[in-house]
Swiss-Prot record:
Binding locations of Zn(2+) 1: H63, H65, H140, D211
CDD domains: RNaseZ_ZiPD-like_MBL-fold
Reactions performed catalytically: Endonucleolytic cleavage of RNA, removing extra 3' nucleotides from tRNA precursor, generating 3' termini of tRNAs. A 3'-hydroxy group is left at the tRNA terminus and a 5'-phosphoryl group is left at the trailer molecule
Cofactor: Zn(2+)
Organism (species): Listeria monocytogenes serovar 1/2a (strain ATCC BAA-679 / EGD-e)
Annotated keywords: Endonuclease, Hydrolase, Metal-binding, Nuclease, tRNA processing, Zinc
EC number: 3.1.26.11
Role of this protein: Zinc phosphodiesterase, which displays some tRNA 3'-processing endonuclease activity. Probably involved in tRNA maturation, by removing a 3'-trailer from precursor tRNA.
Catalytic site positions: D67
Cofactor: record remark: Binds 2 Zn(2+) ions.
Subunit comment: Homodimer.
Source lineage: Bacteria, Bacillati, Bacillota, Bacilli, Bacillales
Stated name of the protein: Ribonuclease Z
Gene: rnz
Residues where Zn(2+) 2 binds: D67, H68, D211, H269
Stretches assigned to coiled coil: none
Length: 306
């Protein structure tokens, strides 16, 4: 899995940063892409990346401010124009369905695929055999969600060396043993596949937050995450301003990462007041509290778990 930051700016686009959008690429895991927020010109950013709209399976909207949703109508239309025909699910606050449907209707846009809308409340919003996604309220004036994506533990690897040492030759029987089945061998021995499977591989945890000021719900959403993506609209000494504007500072994000025992913090949603050099200072500031911090730039790619 990898995170591709398509837009990392706050509020309005700037020369160095487009507005918010993050792609979670899971091509190896499920051959799909999940998108978190879709600010204006997200589809242009996708054209500059390796992301393919045909692989897009789900879109998660954190809140209804324009810098997080104005790119949706164009992106959905282009996906259709490019031949996308698989169904798409959009998760988000109340109003997301009306916004998308009205935009498409008034522009006379007809899609070649169906959109399923899930207007969410806190709790589990999606689960299958591979992932579970939960959402909770943040604090941003309008309803804003944070998402916690948990990859379920994977079955351990089959110990082929142990099987060979026990005189079991490679072949179709290996697949049955890998599935944990009890198998009778040609020589009459009965072996249990469970005895040859290693420890389960721990799944990854990714927490992606919408805009927010400090709030108690952040801790549970971020707890023990491999990656926490958190807004850092302001530098540390502007905590009062951040609170008034319902945003966070670098230091607040770093303190949360430390308290929640996350492995890596990625800062995004950077105000246009900070150019590239000033952004480096934001990173240095956050690292004084949480060393394993990165600051995202447009089109930056981060591997999950590295």
């Amino acid at each position: 899995m990898e995170l591709v930051f398509l837009g990392t700016g706050a509020g309005v686009p700037s020369r160095g940063r487009n507005v918010t959008s993050i792609a979670l690429s899971m091509l190896n895991e499920r051959n799909t892409i999940w998108l978190f927020d879709c600010g204006e010109a997200t589809q242009h950013q996708i054209m500059r990346s390796q992301i393919k709209l045909s692989k897009l399976e789900k879109i998660f909207i954190t809140h209804m401010h324009g810098d997080h949703i104005f790119g949706l109508p164009g992106l959905l239309s282009s996906r259709s124009f490019q031949g996308g025909d698989s169904n798409l699910t959009i998760y988000g606050p109340a109003g997301i369905a009306e916004y998308v449907e009205t935009s498409l209707r008034l522009s006379g846009t007809r899609l070649t695929y169906k959109i399923n809308f899930e207007e969410i409340e806190p709790g589990v919003i999606f689960e299958d055999k591979m992932f579970i996604v939960t959402a909770d309220d943040l604090d941003h004036g309008v309803r804003s969600f944070g998402y916690r994506i948990v990859e379920k533990d994977k079955q351990g690897a089959l110990n082929a060396e142990k099987l060979k040492a026990d005189g079991v030759e490679a072949g179709p029987v290996f697949q049955k043993l890998k599935n944990g089945e009890i198998v009778t061998l040609a020589d009459g021995r009965v072996i249990d596949g469970k005895n040859y499977i290693g420890e389960p591989q721990k799944g990854k945890i990714i927490s992606i937050f919408g805009d927010t000021r400090e709030t108690s719900s952040e801790l549970e959403l971020a707890l023990n995450a491999d990656i926490l993506v958190h807004e850092a609209t302001f530098e540390g000494d502007k905590a009062k301003m951040a609170g008034e504007y319902m945003h966070s500072t670098t230091l607040q994000a770093a303190k949360l990462a430390k308290t929640a025992n996350v492995k890596k913090l990625i800062l995004t949603h950077i105000s246009s007041r900070y150019d590239r050099d000033a952004s480096k200072e934001l990173l240095i500031e956050a690292k004084t509290i949480f060393e394993n911090t990165e600051i995202a730039y447009d089109l930056a790619v981060f591997q999950v778990g590295e």
